[in-house]
Amino acid sequence: MLASTRHIARGDTGNVSVRIRRVTTTRAGGVSAPPFDTFNLGDHVGDDPAAVAANRARLAAAIGLPGNRVVWMNQVHGDRVELVDQPRNTALDDTDGLVTATPRLALAVVTADCVPVLMADARAGIAAAVHAGRAGAQRGVVVRALEVMLSLGAQVRDISALLGPAVSGRNYEVPAAMADEVEAALPGSRTTTAAGTPGVDLRAGIACQLRDLGVESIDVDPRCTVADPTLFSHRRDAPTGRFASLVWME
């Protein structure tokens, strides 16, 4: 069991028809052995499956939900978004975004540098979780998730978004041609790293994208996965684990 929920950062948004809960874990408080120590929640990185299952059970208990009410994805850096409306015992394959209108159904994203995007409309009672890496963000996975939310009755003016911990532009060096390519698909993302080289700030680009689509309530977790040792980072430590970001409604 977790010693306490101090390993989990919580945030609430809105109280119109439902309460929105958002959680981001750290790497502390689990049972995984190095290099996945200790609260690894990714089941695709080479960790002991029993350890991952134990960590996921701890997470579900810590947020007060049965294990099958935490919905996971087998993420592939694509743009597929799935609507979920009931508990699941297995992850959704080849999926990078989840949307639900069902209360007490937590949508989970696992990352170690990519951007976890947690969106919700508390008035309409609709939530979404998106895994937005460079490739998925370029393909429009965040836009796809927003479109599904709107199709269910969400209103752009009522949607709040949290962009969770991810690699910062200061630490995300890429070739100049790649930075230009990402900028073309995601304006506002091209930047310069701390070393003065071409870089990408995915969260800046996604925030610009959401604002252009009419989303005004956007919060960005300031933590950089590469710089913060309490978080998993593939760029810094590969092989390593994954932390989770979740959103659900009560």
Curated annotation (Swiss-Prot):
One of its GO terms (molecular function) is oxidoreductase activity. Its cofactor is Cu(2+); Zn(2+). Signal peptide: none annotated. GO terms for cellular component: peptidoglycan-based cell wall. It catalyses: adenosine + phosphate = alpha-D-ribose 1-phosphate + adenine; S-methyl-5'-thioadenosine + phosphate = 5-(methylsulfanyl)-alpha-D-ribose 1-phosphate + adenine; inosine + phosphate = alpha-D-ribose 1-phosphate + hypoxanthine; adenosine + H2O + H(+) = inosine + NH4(+). Gene3D superfamilies: CNF1/YfiH-like putative cysteine hydrolases. Zn(2+) binds at residues 77, 114, 131. The keyword Acetylation does not apply. Pfam families: Cu-oxidase_4. Keywords: Copper, Hydrolase, Metal-binding, Oxidoreductase, Transferase, Zinc. It comes from the Bacteria. Its EC number is 2.4.2.1, 3.5.4.4, 2.4.2.28. Homodimer. Belongs to the purine nucleoside phosphorylase YfiH/LACC1 family. Purine nucleoside enzyme that catalyzes the phosphorolysis of adenosine and inosine nucleosides, yielding D-ribose 1-phosphate and the respective free bases, adenine and hypoxanthine. Also catalyzes the phosphorolysis of S-methyl-5'-thioadenosine into adenine and S-methyl-5-thio-alpha-D-ribose 1-phosphate. Also has adenosine deaminase activity. This is Purine nucleoside phosphorylase Rv2149c. It comes from Mycobacterium tuberculosis (strain ATCC 25618 / H37Rv).
